[in-house]
Regions:
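Bacterial Sec-dependent N-terminal signal peptides
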Residues: 1-11, 81-98
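Surface-exposed binding patches on compact interaction domains or structured appendages
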Residues: 4-7, 26-57
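Short, solvent-exposed loop/linker segments at the N-terminal edge
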Residues: 12-18
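A short beta-strand segment in extracellular, disulfide-stabilized domains
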Residues: 20-24
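A short beta-strand micro-motif common to beta-rich folds, especially ectodomain repeats
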Residues: 56-58, 66-78
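The feature captures the LRR N-terminal capping module
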Residues: 93-110
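Concave beta-strand-loop units of leucine-rich repeat
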Residues: 98-103, 120-135, 145-158, 170-185, ...
Length: 603
């Protein structure tokens, strides 16, 4: 008959660590086997002849290089027919994402022995088959680098053993759980991890479709970050997110998470967080998160945070976290947001001690926070102190100013709740505000300010100089009077340029205010100039300090309600070049622009 050579398969795939493959060959002739080309270096075969139905064995050497392909030729003895077998051996470097759902798939991936994954490694430990539940990552002990994300979802593991060789995660490291991760106490098993290129996030997750659990406990034994002693850099965000109470698809879900976490021990070598640092707790008095967290002190080498620094606990405070000391932190490029129980009016004072901080993106204080940053000279964006929430802002605004005494530059708005302010002297080094300078006061608050002394070095306000904005601000109707001891603008003596000027005065506010003294050096207003007064007893009678004002560039120049003001001649120089709408009414005298320019500016 016709000679026949029929291998059971034309292509064989092998793992990078090598091993043996068997080829089932059906034949009716004698044959020889030839391993072609460079494949001789990594494919060997002890048997070269057989008859009829044979099993050919080949030994595959370990592959420490790129993926490779070899060919084996089987030739009949008279060379009348031949068959080619292709052997494809994977590299220890896997190209593409790996998604693991359950233990069977985990064992299969572990058997391949990958050292590097050029993609994401996504592991969902829990599925509906409890026998296929992942309880250990031991089989992944060959992986040294993941050039994508590492996502661990809902795992019942006791530790991270199996990831002991992992040195770098190029993307995000995300650990998320719905009623799981309750056996880990630390990060033991990640001892060699020195860099996370993206985010490092641990979080409660929302339920998937079909998951019915409404009361969830996550990370319930985690005490610290031991095991991450070699981690030096997180390129993205570092976030711990506890949901507490959450409504999802019209159903309530409750979480108690991170309640044994006491410290950040284990992260002593972390120097850089490229994104934001955030601890988020949305629990209430029954479903609490971060119950024992009392310190961030183990972040002893952290020098830079590229995004925001945020403690977010709007409903129920993280009660043990009273003092945060980060002595090596020099730079926060984003904002400091401190919201520890402020919606509920909690009065747990947080002391934020950043003694070597030199650069800050911005600061919004809406909680009982004392910021000690005596080396901080520059804030690139906004500085908000106790704004819009007088019950929490007024109690510590003065203490916050005291801790910012080296500030020379605020890039955008500077907004201050003045309810608790007695002196602006700590701002004596301030030279520049790029946005608005806004003074607020609570509608049921009073203050003891005597003057604006403290702003003597301020020369430029890029935005407006504002008093009386919003409902809880100077100018609100209340049983108290706001800024009742202020008589003039003394303190702004070197101010030469502002982006606009606005005073909105209601009944009883600025009750002793009589003159614009202190603004003698003001030369330029790049926007509108408006004064609106609703108090017929208001005492402003002297604007002679505006004699040197050269230009007002806005579309509106308005003075209303200054019943004692009768002399507008100091505005003559500014009105000479003014192109907008000028109006005066309900004053002691109400001249037009033309009257002032013609020498009739005084009654």
């Amino acid at each position: 008959g016709v000679p026949s050579l029929s291998p059971s398969s034309k292509t064989y795939h092998t793992y990078p660590k090598g091993g043996e493959i068997s080829v089932s060959l059906t034949t009716n002739t004698n044959y020889t086997v030839e391993i072609l080309g460079d494949a001789k270096e990594w494919i060997t075969q002890p048997q070269t002849r057989g008859f009829r139905e044979d099993i050919l064995s080949f030994f595959i050497s370990e592959n420490n290089g790129d993926k490779r392909t070899g060919e084996i030729k089987i030739i009949s003895e008279n060379e009348e027919t031949e068959s080619i077998i292709t052997v494809e051996q994977e590299s220890y470097i896997h190209e593409g994402n790996i998604s693991i759902r359950g233990n069977q798939k985990l064992q299969e991936i572990g058997e391949r022995g990958y050292k590097q994954i050029n993609g994401n490694l996504d592991i969902l430990c829990f599925n509906n088959n409890k026998e296929d539940m992942i309880t250990s990552l031991e089989v992944l002990n060959s992986i040294t680098q993941i050039n994508g994300d590492l996502i661990l979802n809902n795992c019942d593991i006791e530790n991270f053993n199996g990831l002991n060789q992992l040195r770098k995660i190029q993307g995000d490291f995300v650990i998320e759980s719905l009623n799981n991760f309750n056996r880990i106490e630390s990060f033991n098993g990640l001892d060699n991890l020195d860099e996370i290129g993206g985010d490092f996030i641990m979080k409660d997750r929302l339920p998937y479709n079909g998951e019915k659990s409404t009361v969830n406990s996550n990370f319930s034994r985690l005490k610290d970050f031991k095991g991450l002693e070699n981690l030096k850099k997180i390129g993205g965000n570092f976030q711990l997110i506890g949901l507490g109470y959450f409504r999802y698809q019209n159903s309530p879900y409750y979480y108690t998470s991170f309640n044994e976490l006491e410290s950040f021990e284990g992260l002593e070598r972390l120097t850089t967080i490229g994104g934001s640092f955030k601890i988020s707790s949305e629990g209430n008095d029954k479903y609490v998160t971060f119950k024992k967290l009392s310190s961030l002190n183990n972040l002893t080498n952290l020098a830079s945070i590229g995004g925001n620094f945020e403690i977010y606990a709007p409903e129920y405070e993280i009660a043990q976290l009273n003092t945060i000391e980060l002595p090596t932190l020099k730079q926060i490029n984003g904002y400091i947001y401190m919201r520890n129980g402020f919606y509920m009016g909690n009065k747990n004072r947080m002391n934020l001690v950043l003694e070597n901080l030199e650069k800050l993106g911005g600061f919004e204080c809406k909680s009982y926070t004392i910021l000690n940053a005596l080396k901080l000279k520059r804030i690139d964006e906004k500085l908000y102190i106790g704004v819009t929430a007088s019950k929490v802002g007024s109690i510590n605004a003065q203490e916050i100013l005291n801790g910012l005494s080296s500030i020379t530059y605020v890039g955008k708005d500077l907004r201050i709740d003045c309810s608790g302010i007695e002196s602006f002297e700590p701002l004596g080094n301030l030279e520049f505000v790029g946005g608005d300078l806004i003074f607020d006061i609570g509608s049921s608050e009073r203050n003891n300010l005597q003057s604006f002394i403290g702003f003597e070095n301020l020369t430029t306000i890029g935005g407006r100089l504002i008093w009386g904005t919003g409902v809880s601000s100077a100018g609100s109707v209340s049983t108290y009077t706001s800024f009742s001891n202020i008589q003039s603008f003394q303190g702004f003596n070197n101010l030469s340029s502002i982006g606009g000027f606005r005073m909105s005065i209601n009944y009883g506010d600025f009750s002793k205010f009589t003159s614009f003294a202190g603004l003698e050096n003001l030369r330029q207003i790049k926007g509108d100039f408006t004064i609106e007064v609703e108090d017929s007893f208001w005492g402003l009678s002297d604007i002679s300090a505006l004699t040197n004002l050269e230009t007002v560039e806005g579309s509106e120049f308005k003075i209303k309600g200054c019943y004692k003001l009768e002399d507008f001649t100091p505005l003559k120089q500014a009105l000479t070049s003014y192109q907008g709408t000028f109006s005066t009414y309900s004053n002691g005298y109400n001249p037009t622009k033309e009257q002032i320019l013609n020498g009739e500016g005084k009654q």
